[in-house]
């Protein structure tokens, strides 16, 4: 990758990442206000939404030909990378354990991982259906 393409990719990732992080904040804030702080609904929601959209986008960018690289940087690496958050998932699990609510950790991890996997496959199926020539 030459220097110009590298810088273009970096700018696309930063732009998408800023938007994705802002979107994560908005979704998390709305769900916190609606459901309270008893369960990390915001992190769960953004990770499941991100899984679905990533599956869809993976198929969609493959259909873009040579422009697919730029779209991948902007939308998958940037936007979805900024929207979803593995570190928050782990921190929330630690908080549950430290607050003597460790039984919820297994439930939270199972839901996140199982539904995340399901959603990425569903998004890819939708992407294949929508992008089918």
UniProtKB/Swiss-Prot annotation:
Membrane-crossing residue ranges in chain numbering: 3-23, 41-61, 76-96, 103-123
Record entry for activity regulation: Na(+) is not transported, but it plays an essential structural role and its presence is essential for fluoride channel function.
Swiss-Prot/TrEMBL catalytic activity: fluoride(in) = fluoride(out)
Superkingdom, natural source: Bacteria
GO annotation (BP), single: cellular detoxification of fluoride
Subcellular location, principal: membrane
Compartment(s): Cell inner membrane
Name of the protein this chain belongs to: Fluoride-specific ion channel FluC
Organism annotation: Xylella fastidiosa (strain Temecula1 / ATCC 700964)
